[in-house]
UniProtKB/Swiss-Prot annotation:
It is found in: Endoplasmic reticulum membrane. Residues 52-70 have a biased composition (Basic residues). Residues 76-85 have a biased composition (Acidic residues). SUPFAM superfamilies: Winged helix' DNA-binding domain. The chain crosses the membrane at residues 1-21. Belongs to the DDRGK1 family. Signal peptide: none annotated. Residues 22-310 are cytoplasmic. Keywords: Endoplasmic reticulum, Membrane, Transmembrane, Transmembrane helix, Ubl conjugation pathway. This is DDRGK domain-containing protein 1. GO terms for cellular component: endoplasmic reticulum membrane. It is a single-pass membrane protein.
Length: 310
């Protein structure tokens, strides 16, 4: 009998303990709920009749609150997106399944603007680089042309100096060949006499117009070869102009007469020696100051070719 009583007391204690645990669990869940959940729980336990208009206002208010919450969420996401995009962390838009169409379109527009901006910057840099390259090429071309001009001018200057030096040396040698030996004469007097003899040599040929080289050599007590060399030197110095035939005659022709002959040949085109000889009487004056006149035919009796040295 005592055992039965003991078992009954144990069963009652177990039931009381189970009920206490259930009540404690229910109280804990009730405390965690928010005020809205408590209100809803109370409303369900004690339903209070509400008017339709009040329910509409409350629904509109809840919808407005949800819209504000969504906009705030979008703004926060935009700020986050802009911050990382400006810092260069967001290279391409990250798509999410929960992302709306409007947000997706906005991200695509941002990506397109960024790509367009990068393309414009690349084109601008490329344009600047091309301009700099053209400017460098232009400066290099100007420097090259300037250097070529300087080199050409320097070469022409050196050539002119060498020619002048060579002509001057030839002139000195020519003067020395006409020097005379006079006892008691100074260097200045000898140089003056040499210059006088040189000018006399030139005037002798110009005045006679047509001279035999042997006669010139005999007149100035020179060898015929020396006379030829002196005439060639004077022609290179533009002190004499004329032609030498194969019979040892030198015909002096002035610059004006050479220009007239050149004009005649240019007007007629190609001309033969005989045609030139026929027209030379009217183009070249062969009258000498001390001798009788000569004709060009007397100089060109043979068909030998005449060389003109201008």
């Amino acid at each position: 009998m005592a055992a039965i009583i003991y078992l009954a007391i144990a069963a009652v204690a177990s039931i009381l303990l189970f009920v206490a645990v259930k009540l404690l669990s229910t109280d804990t869940k009730t405390e965690i709920r928010t005020d809205d959940d408590v209100g809803e729980l109370i409303g369900r336990e004690n339903p209070v009749p509400q008017r339709p208009r009040a329910r509409a206002r409350r629904g509109l208010r809840n919808k407005t609150n949800r819209s504000k919450t969504q906009r705030q969420h979008d703004n926060d996401y935009d700020d986050y997106d802009d911050e990382y995009q400006d810092d260069g962390f967001l290279e391409e838009p990250v798509y999410d399944r929960k992302m709306g169409t409007k947000k997706l379109r906005k991200l695509e527009e941002k990506a397109e603007k960024k790509a367009m901006r990068e393309q414009m910057e690349a084109e601008r840099e490329d344009k600047i680089n091309r301009q700099e390259l053209r400017e460098q090429n232009r400066r290099k071309e100007e420097e090259r042309k300037a250097k070529e001009r300087e080199e050409k001018e320097e070469a022409e200057r050196k050539l002119k100096e060498e020619q002048e030096k060579r002509e001057y040396e030839e002139y000195l040698r020519l003067k020395e060949s006409f020097s005379v030996e006079n006892e008691g004469s100074g260097e200045a007097e000898i140089a003056q006499e040499s210059q006088s003899l040189l000018q006399e040599f030139i005037d002798y040929i110009k005045n006679n117009k047509v001279v035999l080289l042997e006669d010139v050599a005999a007149h100035f007590k020179l060898r015929t070869e020396d006379v030829i060399n002196r005439i060639q030197t004077l022609q290179s110095m533009d002190r004499l102009t004329g032609v030498v035939d194969d019979r040892g005659k030198y015909i002096y022709i002035s610059v004006e007469e050479l220009n007239a002959i050149a004009k005649f040949i240019k007007q007629r085109g190609r001309v033969s020696i005989s045609e030139l000889a026929e027209s030379s009487n009217s183009l070249i004056n062969l009258q000498s100051d001390s001798k009788a006149s000569h004709t060009i035919e007397s100089v060109n009796d043979s068909p030998a070719e005449i060389s003109v040295n201008a």
